[in-house]
């Protein structure tokens, strides 16, 4: 009971305090002049250009990050669940990015996206996708995608290890029975694998959504909050 009381106190007290302040005309330089104004602050917020832009960026950032991490994490988990020589080594190497701190991830990818010596721009040039040097951090769109790529690289291992642990609980007898019935690889995935890992996948998506919304280190280290 004491644990629930403590958790409730540290969770709900700040929430209600914040809501109480949000419905008042609260000015830091005039603490005694606060007065109740209802939902006026929320109305003003919805017409604030900076807030709207920040909200849009947050949605793009979260959806792109979680979507890419979920897709590639699932692919990696399926590959690592197969039997092949050196699987243990590949698993260890695959999970390395998750152990790297956000500041170091930002440093690595900032160097890779560097206009002069970055390997990303060089590869895109050789593939004919871009012509000449590309300054990734000179505009908001390319800077956003540079950060998304960096954070996706860091987050894929978490999806992979979560999904892989769920895949390993599925009995091979189910797949063998499906093969006897003539089911192909695609049918097995949609009818057996995906339904059985659905709960794990949804929980992982929920966790990564919360964590992605709270990412600060990569964003600030790569762009200092801009452009």
Q: Can you say where each PLM-predicted feature lies in the sequence?
A:
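A structural signal for multi-pass alpha-helical bundles of membrane permease subunits
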Residues: 1-227
């Amino acid at each position: 009971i004491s644990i629930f009381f403590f958790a409730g106190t540290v969770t709900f007290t700040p929430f209600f305090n914040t809501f109480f302040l949000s419905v008042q005309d609260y000015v830091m330089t005039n603490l005694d002049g606060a007065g109740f104004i209802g939902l006026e602050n929320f109305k003003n917020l919805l017409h604030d250009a900076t807030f709207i832009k920040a909200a849009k960026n947050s949605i793009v950032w979260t959806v792109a990050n979680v979507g890419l991490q979920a897709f590639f994490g699932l692919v990696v988990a399926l590959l690592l669940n197969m039997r092949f020589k050196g699987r243990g080594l590949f698993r260890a190497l695959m999970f390395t990015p998750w152990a790297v701190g956000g500041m170091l991830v930002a440093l690595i990818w900032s160097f890779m996206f560097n206009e002069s010596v970055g390997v990303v721009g060089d590869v895109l040039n050789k593939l004919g996708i871009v012509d000449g040097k590309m300054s990734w951090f000179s505009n908001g769109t390319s800077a956003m995608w540079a950060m998304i790529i960096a954070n996706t690289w860091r987050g894929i291992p978490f999806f992979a290890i979560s999904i892989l642990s769920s895949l390993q609980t599925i009995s091979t007898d189910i797949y063998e029975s499906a093969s006897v019935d003539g089911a192909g690889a695609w049918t097995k995935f949609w009818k057996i694998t995906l339904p059985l890992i659905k709960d794990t996948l949804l929980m992982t998506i929920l966790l990564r959504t919360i964590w992605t919304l709270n990412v600060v280190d990569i964003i600030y280290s790569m762009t200092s909050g801009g452009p």
